[in-house]
Structure formats: C-alpha cells, structure tokens
Amino acid sequence: MKNLVSNLRFFSSYSSSIVPRCSNIPKPILNPLYNLLPQSQNPSKIVDVICSTLNHSDYSVLLPNLRDEVKSLIPHLGYPEISRVLLRFQSDASRAITFFKWVKFDLGKRPNVGNYCLLLHILVSSKKFPLAMQFLCELIELTSKKEEVDVFRVLVSATDECNWDPVVFDMLVKGYLKLGLVEEGFRVFREVLDSGFSVSVVTCNHLLNGLLKLDLMEDCWQVYSVMCRVGIHPNTYTFNILTNVFCNDSNFREVDDFLEKMEEEGFEPDLVTYNTLVSSYCRRGRLKEAFYLYKIMYRRRVVPDLVTYTSLIKGLCKDGRVREAHQTFHRMVDRGIKPDCMSYNTLIYAYCKEGMMQQSKKLLHEMLGNSVVPDRFTCKVIVEGFVREGRLLSAVNFVVELRRLKVDIPFEVCDFLIVSLCQEGKPFAAKHLLDRIIEEEGHEAKPETYNNLIESLSRCDAIEEALVLKGKLKNQNQVLDAKTYRALIGCLCRIGRNREAESLMAEMFDSEVKPDSFICGALVYGYCKELDFDKAERLLSLFAMEFRIFDPESYNSLVKAVCETGCGYKKALELQERMQRLGFVPNRLTCKYLIQVLEQPSLPNHLPEN
C-alpha cells in the first residue's frame, strides 16, 4: 500500500482505480424467490427502495416515514447495505448525511467503522470540512478504547470504493489532537507519513504543542525530524514551539547550532525568539545559559528590551541573588529602558522575602517618583513582608502613608492586616484601621473580619466593644460563627457576667450553631466561680443529654470546686455518682480531687456508710 499511494500526497483522487480494490463491501446473496415479493417487502431491494426515496426532491420529508412503510425490511439493513446506499450518493453529501442520520437516530442502528469512513470520504471530497471533523471526532471517541480498530487503515481501505481526498488523513491527526489524545495523534501522524500521505504544517504545530505540554521532548524532536525528511516546511509558529522545546531539553552550548538551523530554514531569530529562550532558562534556574544568550543577542545585533531584563532580574531574585538583580536593574535603566510595575515588583518581592523592608519601601517611593503606579501585588507583598517580620505597626503606618499619597490599596490587603493585628492581640489598632477605611472609602468588611475582631477584643476582655460589633453583625443579618460565640461566652464568664453568657448560648441554639466543650467549660467555670454548683451540674447534664458532649475538664472543674469549698466528701461522692449515671467517666484527676478532700482534717474520721 505504501508504494502504491506514496505519490498521492498533495492532490485529490476521484478515481477508485489508483489504489487496488480490496472488496470491503460483500455482495448480497440473492434468493430467486424474493423476486416474487412486492418491492417494499423484498429484502434484496432494500437499497433500491431507500435510494428511490432519497432521489425524491422531498427526500428529507419522505425518509422519516419510510421506516413504517418498509418495517419488515429494516432487519435486513446491515452494514453492507448502509455502505451501498452511501456509495450511491457519494457525489451528493447532503443526501448521504441525511441517510446516515436516519439510520443512526430514526432506526437506532449504530453504523460501523467502515460506514463512518465512507461518510468521511464523501464529506471531505465535498469540502464539508466542519461536518467531517464532527463525525471524525465521534468515530475517534467510539474507537479510542478499542485497540483492534485502526481508523487510519479502515480509511485507507475505504479509498478503494469511493471518491476521496488525502486531506482526510491530515484531519484524522487533527481529530485525535482536538480530543486531547496527543500520543494517539502522534502514532497516527507516523502512520500517515509512513504510508506516503502528507500532513499540513498547521497540524504538525498542533502536534508539537501537545507533545510539549506533555513534556515529551524526544517526540517533539522526532516530529521535527520527520517534517524535515518529508519536506514539510516549518513556519514561525513551529520555531516558537521548538524554542520552548529546546529550552526544556537542550544544553546551552547547542544554542548557536539551534539559531543557525533556524536561519538556514529562512527563519530569522528575532527579539521574541531570544526573549522566549531567556525567559525559559530563567524560569528553570539556568541563569548561566540565560546570560550566555543575553551576550549572544548583542553579538547578533538584537538589542535586549524590558522583557529580557525583567526575565533576568526575576531569575536572579529566584536564585536568592537580590543584589545582582538590583545591579541588572540599574544596568537596564542606564541603557535607557524605563522599568515598569512588573520589574519593580520583582525586586520588591525579593527584598520582602529577605526581610529587607527598607529597601522595599525605597523602591516603592522610586516607583512613585517615576510615575509608575503600584498595583495590588506591590501593596500586598510589602504589607505581608512587615507582618512576617512581626512589624505590624510599621505595616499600619505604611498603609496610612500610601493612602495619604493617594495610592489605591486593595481592601483585601487592609483586611489581611486587620486580621493579622487581631491574631497578634492588637484589636484596638485593628478596629481603628477598619473604622478609618469604612469612613473614608465606604468599604464594609467581610463577616469573617468582624468575627476575628470580636474574638480578639474578647480575648483582651474588651467585652463592650466586642458586643457592639456583634450587634452590628446581627443587624446586617449575619450569623456569628462558633469561634466568635466561644470567645464572647468565654470572656463574659471570665469577668463574671454569666447571665449574659447564658443568653448568648440561647442565641446560639436559635441560630442553629452547635455549642462545643469549650462553651460548656466556660459556663461551668463561671458558675463554679459564683458557687452555683447546681447550675453547673444542670449544664453538664444538658450538654451530655442534648449534644452528647462529655467534657472531662468541665466535669473535673465542678468536682474540684465542690471539693475545695468544704462541702465534704459525701457531697462530692454523690455528685460523682450522678455524673457517672449520665455517662461521665472519672479519670486520674477526678480521683486526685476526691482523695484530697478525704485527707482534709476538717472531715469526719469515718467514711459514710454504704
């Protein structure tokens, strides 16, 4: 087959005599008795009946009704009959596609691979490429998991029977790539070329790009080698892809050879090519190669631009060589190239990462002096840098300074700083910053920010301020989270405001926020502090029975309080028995408290009788 069709690469064929016939479609076995039947009931006439309907001017209307008219013949419509109908209409793609869809959808029969391939040849030779690609992708999906089916071979075999155009084989490779089956596409690509057919440079580029994304560098070079061997001329896009392949796969000493090869192919390496190479090397930490290319650019009279220098600066920063990066930055400025926000951000980020905040601020002021507007990233990395260094007040002052200079600061940066202040136990500074932002810009903080602020104020026992914020959230119909309730209830119990803590717990229940062992412990602590042991016991019972929360720390707090107040061993023992009936299990600490109360001199000399 390879020898017979090797010179069919670039032209269409409308003769089935060029390729040897392989008689794909079996001839029907005719029974003489069938001729005694009416045509609509004669199995040997099913193809004629269908074709007669298709030849009618109203075929699209008549064909759907044909199923009922020839109902008895439908079981005799097999794959060979479908193929014969398609072949009769190979010069009329509209009727062929109407018939194919009728078989598939109205009759519910699934055409086989051979039927699909005949239809594809008909559509491609009729120049109906989008429709052909649709059915081609459908065929690939049907056969992609069947190793025994080779769509390419069936397509080649089908050329014996009908008009065809070699572009169908190019489309076959594209179809696999379109469906993301890159490795299968590569296999078919080799099959197509080994059989003497051609593939377009556009398809080759798609294949190269797919293989590059899969990190299959050797296969990329194989594709390029085959392209050169069979005479498919690469274009600009080909070399752009190969540039990326080269950066991933090659040694920098081969750069000159690669660039010379590009020139031999008539492709002049330009600034974009060099920038792609430099950027790729810098991203992979291959700075020696990147600077080698930077020198080659001058030798070849290609002047590096802002993109080149930014890539080099970024590579040096990534390697921890911040001072060298800054020197490269100065060299760029000295050569008349004006830095942009990205080049400044690269250096600022590197200095922040090294904890050199003064240098970062200095660069920011330099940006403003050069009329380069800082973006979200600039503000974010500097604020995060101050926070990482534990210099939260410096971060606040920095934000205030930027606002004074009319620099737009993203609210999420301020939000991050507010939360950081809360986590560091500085809720008043956080609240002051939030109030200022709301007053000046009208931004409203997220519920999570308010929750963090309430928690921080509660931890500092600033309960009044915390309750004001909590009321604000409730007025906005926002639900407090469990952490916020924990902080508020814990604070109220700590400062002896147990009734308010109880009200908050009831509010939790109404809001369907489940309490936890911390809230149980906080309330037990508050009740014990007031010597209200009965209430503490009732609370433990409520949590055990309603929420299945058996908190040993809360239980031990109550036992300890009972023992330390001189209530006597008998009362402590009775409490323990009641708790055990609820499901509480005494531990070593419980036993320790009971033993301590037993050893107190004020106790009677004998234990109570059982």
UniProtKB/Swiss-Prot annotation:
Q: Does the keyword Repeat apply?
A: yes
InterPro entries attached here? Pentatricopeptide_rpt, PPR-containing_protein, TPR-like_helical_dom_sf
Q: Mind listing the UniProt keywords for this protein, alphabetically?
A: Repeat
Query: Would the keyword Membrane be found if you checked this record's keyword annotation?
Result: no
Q: What is this protein called?
A: Pentatricopeptide repeat-containing protein At5g40400
Which family, according to UniProt? Belongs to the PPR family. P subfamily.
The residues forming a coiled coil are none
Each PPR repeat, start to end: 165-199, 200-234, 235-269, 270-304, 305-339, 340-374, 375-409, 410-445, 446-480, 481-515, 516-546, 551-586
- Give the originating organism: Arabidopsis thaliana (Mouse-ear cress)
User: Could you name the domain of life of the organism this protein comes from?
Assistant: Eukaryota
